[in-house]
Every structure is written in structure tokens, then in C-alpha cells.
Amino acid sequence: MLPNTPRRAVYAGSFDPPTLGHLWMIRQAQSMFDELIVAIGINPDKRNTYTVAERQDMLCAITDNFPNVRIEVFQNRFLVHYAREVDAGFIVRGIRSTSDYEYERSMRHINSDLAPEISTVFLMPPREIAEVSSTMIKGLVGPEGWMETVKRYVPPAVYQKMIAEHHNNNA
């Protein structure tokens, strides 16, 4: 990295939907780097609950007070190649468990083989949100009392979107 070059990082995920764990990661990473790109990765083999546009809107809503964060979308390429394309020197990954660590450690080695100039930074969220995942959140929606439960794990803007979506699907 050249002197006076902004320290840019990429934090990627499906964000379907964004959780408090994602928000924690974004908050931490944006304080560590000059610029953080939150990149929605499109996997055509994965069935998503929310459209790319809806996920972008939710991410914009929860990051609007972070001036150094921008939301982008990428597909059909490795994350490390995307990071290189946007001149990011860092990839930020969350570690929630030992299985996450094992997987991310292996990916870090592969990424290093593909782009040795890009470093991977691991962040570990606090215990109270470490087990929160988008898949878990989606699995809670529906049964009686789901709204109070889900409210604990997602940012308010995401919570409102989830309520509206559930209402529209059941109207």
C-alpha cells in the first residue's frame, strides 16, 4: 500500500437479513479503516428471502450514520478478486465459533495464494450476539411471539422490514 493511500476494507456477506451481529462487525470495521465496503455477495444457487435491493436498503438504513461505509454488490468472482478490483487491502471476516475459525483460516490461506497483498482481519463479536445468524433469524419468524424474539437480534430498520414483509405475505 502506498503512503497516503486510504486503508480500504471489504466486509462481505449475504445479509439476508442484516443482524445485530452484522451491525457490530460493520461498526468495528468502519472504526479500523478509512473506508469500509459492505459487499452483498450474490450466490445464484442460494435462495434468499429478501431481494438484493431490499438488502441494500436495509444495509443503507443501518449504516447511514457511518460516512466511511458504502454498500455494493458483487457476483461471479472470488471475494479476494473483488477486493482487489475495489483496491481494498483488507478483507474483514467474523468469527462466531471454532468451525467459523477453521473455515475462515482455510479461506485466508487460499486468498493469500490468490492475492498476497490483501490481508484478512478476523473479528470476534461479543458472546450475546456471537450465535446470531441470518438463517437463525429467518427460522424464528412465524410462530406466536416471533416479533418480540426477533426484535432482540436485528436492528430496528430491519425489524420493521421483517414485520412488513411477514404482514404482506400473510395478508
From Swiss-Prot:
Biological process terms in GO annotation: coenzyme A biosynthetic process
Sites where the protein binds substrate: S14, K46, L79, R93
4Fe-4S is among the record's keywords: no
Localization per Swiss-Prot or TrEMBL: Cytoplasm
Coiled coil: none
Annotated positions binding ATP: S14, F15, H22, G94, I95, R96, E104, I129, A130, E131, V132, S133, S134, T135
An annotated Gene Ontology molecular function: ATP binding
EC number of the protein: 2.7.7.3
One Pfam family, short name: CTP_transf_like
GO cellular-component term (any): cytoplasm
Source organism, top-level taxon: Bacteria
SUPFAM superfamilies: Nucleotidylyl transferase
Site residues (Transition state stabilizer), renumbered to this chain: H22
Keywords, ordered alphabetically: ATP-binding, Coenzyme A biosynthesis, Cytoplasm, Magnesium, Nucleotide-binding, Nucleotidyltransferase, Transferase
Function of the molecule: Reversibly transfers an adenylyl group from ATP to 4'-phosphopantetheine, yielding dephospho-CoA (dPCoA) and pyrophosphate.
Subunit organization: Homohexamer.
Name of the protein: Phosphopantetheine adenylyltransferase
Gene assigned in the entry: coaD
